Amino acid sequence: MNESTINTVLFDLDGTLINTNELIIASFQHTLDHYYPGQYSREEILHFIGPSLFDTFSAMDPDLTDDMIQMYRTFNHEQHDLLVTEYETVLDTLKVLQDRGFKLGIVTTKIRDTVLMGLKLTGLEPFFEVIVTLDDVQNEKPHPEPVQLALSKLGSDPHEAVMVGDNYHDILSGQAAGTKTAGVAWSIKGEEALFKHRPDFMLKKMSDLLAIVGAD
């Protein structure tokens, strides 16, 4: 496929469009310090970024999963507006893509309420025709279902789309759904961690996407 045939761009949210890393780390630290005082360092918490809260907390203690998720989300919402920012060139890139008629969507493992908080805070909400959240699917990334659902809602074929994300779940989900994939070099887990999963492209900044899809 020639990448100039791409007319649809799907984005992960956290760590891709908006910088929620410090919010996520603080939310995990707050929750884990309550249930497991002193047991988890910042470096260990980095491994929890990407999978759903259910997967992370149920692996620790199935009986406490719901309580831990509730504590995490309460803290996360309280601190949200203090700790969330957008990444460099994101807004300008989205403006160009929208002006050129690209179909834009978000595919995330967050719940819808929290997604909308971040989009409204950063002014990104108007750019997206479709937002697929954890509430909308039976299977989260890296399963292809979330990407497939977004493509279906946008009326796009996989070969016309690229999935952009900061985590291996994003790359694997896009690959399984048949799209091109792009990793972001500003991933908190590091560029090398994404290269292991062979994304088609690696973005040093979001505006690099414009040349890839023929919108530069």
Curated annotation (Swiss-Prot):
Its cofactor is Mg(2+). Keywords: Hydrolase, Magnesium. GO terms for molecular function: inorganic diphosphate phosphatase activity; magnesium ion binding; phosphoglycolate phosphatase activity. The active site is at D12 (nucleophile). It comes from Bacillus pumilus (strain SAFR-032). The gene is ppaX. Gene3D superfamilies: HAD superfamily/HAD-like, Putative phosphatase, domain 2. The keyword tRNA-binding does not apply. It is an enzyme of class 3 (hydrolase). Belongs to the HAD-like hydrolase superfamily. PpaX family. CDD domains: HAD_PPase (cd02616). Its EC number is 3.6.1.1. It catalyses: diphosphate + H2O = 2 phosphate + H(+). InterPro entries: HAD-like_hydrolase_sf, HAD-like_sf, HAD-SF_hydro_IA, HAD_2, HAD_sf, PGP-like_dom2, Pyrophosphatase_Ppax. Pfam families: HAD_2. One of its GO terms (cellular component) is cytosol. PANTHER family: PHOSPHOGLYCOLATE PHOSPHATASE, PYROPHOSPHATASE PPAX. This is Pyrophosphatase PpaX. Hydrolyzes pyrophosphate formed during P-Ser-HPr dephosphorylation by HPrK/P. Might play a role in controlling the intracellular pyrophosphate pool.
